[in-house]
Amino acid sequence: MSDANLRARIRMSTVYTVANNLGYLVVGTDNAAEIHTGYFTKYGDGGVDLVPLANLTKREVYEWAKALGIHEDIINKAPSAGLWEGQTDEIEMGTTYDMIDAVVEGRLEEVPNKDKEIIERLHRISEHKRHTAAAPPKF
């Protein structure tokens, strides 16, 4: 996992270098499901200036993609961070985006206990990713 996180951080450093040279901001692609579960690399793909999809579930992202005319091959491709061959988000997390979306939307009655436990654990262990670095109080 540390190798995959390193790759994400190197990729983000490259993106920021290009953005800085061109005077651009870096836009992230994380959605509500990924943010809730912490399915992003701290200071990697999570290190961006803007996160326009942050309040959209994965389902809503797909709906927007269809409405915007994004090619079906892209929409139907299994979500993957692309950090190693054959990797998919859902296999790595052990649950589906449909289940995560249901939790994010408060539809807990639709989520089997096994999936709830996985999603709650992912949320709990990734809490540090959703906050800026802690600083001591000023004395």
Language-model features, listed with the residues they occupy:
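ATP/NTP-dependent adenylation/nucleotidyl-transfer catalytic domains that generate, transfer
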Residues: 1-9, 13-16, 20-25, 29-139
